Amino acid sequence: GGLMRHTKAAIRIAYELLENKTIGGNFSSDQKYLMLFALLIHDGLKSGIQQEQYTRFDHPLLASNYVKDNKDKLTLNDEEIKFICECIESHMGEWNVDYNGNEVLPLPKNRFQKFVHMCDFLSSRKFLDIKFENDEIVE
């Protein structure tokens, strides 16, 4: 569906940018993997932990908390968990205020968080016509 395509597009955009030496050369291998992991799961709880009818505005916080709650099942250290969670929490960028004007989500602060936001943002732009066939990106 649409969410899976969006996630695949975000990851592909990130991968292509990170493979570019001018852009990707500014990140270590570990940083690249952690940003890709954050993109893989950034919208995983978009409809809540229990499937809800509408998108949860706080879904980045739900996903981040899910990672923290399940960190013992991962082979990541505390610093890596923090890195991933901060990228997930801030992936919405400037769309961090709820319908009542409350600032719910943090803004991206560092280059890693801004990179994850950029890839998420670009994958949602309709003018970037990423072709899919059977939910797979077509070259």
Predicted features along the sequence, with ranges:
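Active-site metal-coordination segments of metallo-dependent hydrolases
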Residues: 1-9, 49-62
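Alpha-helical phosphate/pyrophosphate-handling elements in metalloenzyme active cores
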Residues: 1-34
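Amphipathic alpha-helical interaction surfaces
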Residues: 13-20, 43-50, 69, 94
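Single-residue recognition of alpha-helix boundary sites
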Residues: 17, 53-54, 131
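His-Asp-centered metal-binding catalytic motifs of divalent-metal-dependent phosphohydrolases/nucleases
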Residues: 28-52, 63, 88-92, 120
